[in-house]
Amino acid sequence: MKRHDKMPALSLLILAGGKSSRMKKDKSQLPWQDSTTLTHMLTNSYVYPFEHTVISANRIIEPQEIPDFIRQSSIQDGHTTEYIRNRGLDTERHLAIVSDRYSDCGPLGGMEAAMRLYPSDRWLILAVDLPFFDFSRVPALLAADASEYDAVIPVVDGRENPLAALYKGRVYEKIRTALAADDYRVRKIYNKKAVFIDETPYARQYLNMNTPIAYKEALACVTNQNRPVPVVSITAETSGTGKTHLITQVIKELSAQGYRVGYVKSTHHMSTGPKRNSDTDLATRAGAVCTALIPDGPKKSRAIEDAAFSMSVDLVLIESRRHGLFPKLLVLPPEAGAAEGDNETVALVTRRKDTNSVYFNTLHVDNISALVKYIKLLANL
């Protein structure tokens, strides 16, 4: 995205002070692309000339969490830290870190602290757990604004995103009133005075990471984004789960949608060439345009990776018990209602309707359309 040097004055607030109760760890410190979610968002934010950039955080933000190109000089004043960067011919850029005056009040506490200390006509309010927000949609949000509105709220698939939205500075008084009444709903401050903009075509920008599952799915998306070709592995801890049949159904559906699918099969048998009704033959007949059979060997995982990345396709599906690449879908045996999986497993594929997990998404083996939709999400298709 190019810098927007002549856009209307606008300040940025990054909300990094939440309890992260569902994530069970501080979302602002989650590893993301060789840094953290907070550092990544700060780095991306400098494509836009914000009047003020403020981080709301109820912890100490270490200097190393601030990108090097921002961290040039700092001033500390009580619960506020300011970083000032002079861009040579550019204007100065200010980054401030503030803590809430009103504790345990959710996002409104951070909004009150920022708006009180740094008055601004407009604010872009962002939760820190939006790893794909690259600020390219800021001009569209500004274009939808009008004097009578207090907020511009993006809507994705019918769902409002008030923590990735544009607010007028005048909502500060509404925030104070809401806090005084112990009403901490963000919607309270823009209800009936907002314009809603459909951002469904840009849904990835608003994908947030509220849970361990969402974080793992986001990691899968960015991992595949950086690969020569996206990969999804379908695995099973035992035989007899029906994973090969499942894969052929997935290949058939993806092929019908116009995608070129590759298939890599990990096996402990020696390869003897093409064979009727073999797994690779079934994959080919289902629509796979490339297949590879990888036998056991000292560098099997590398061989699987090389085979997958050499295929000129839209997506590669890997079938394996132990050597698949991240992200993995684990197919459960018919009687199983749960599984431990591993750090690379993002979802369980089950025949039971009572399978639930806080660590993995769950998909039903007979719902091929939902399974294909999920695979496309992980593969950025």
State where each predicted segment sits.
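Glycine-rich phosphate-binding P-loop
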Residues: 232-255
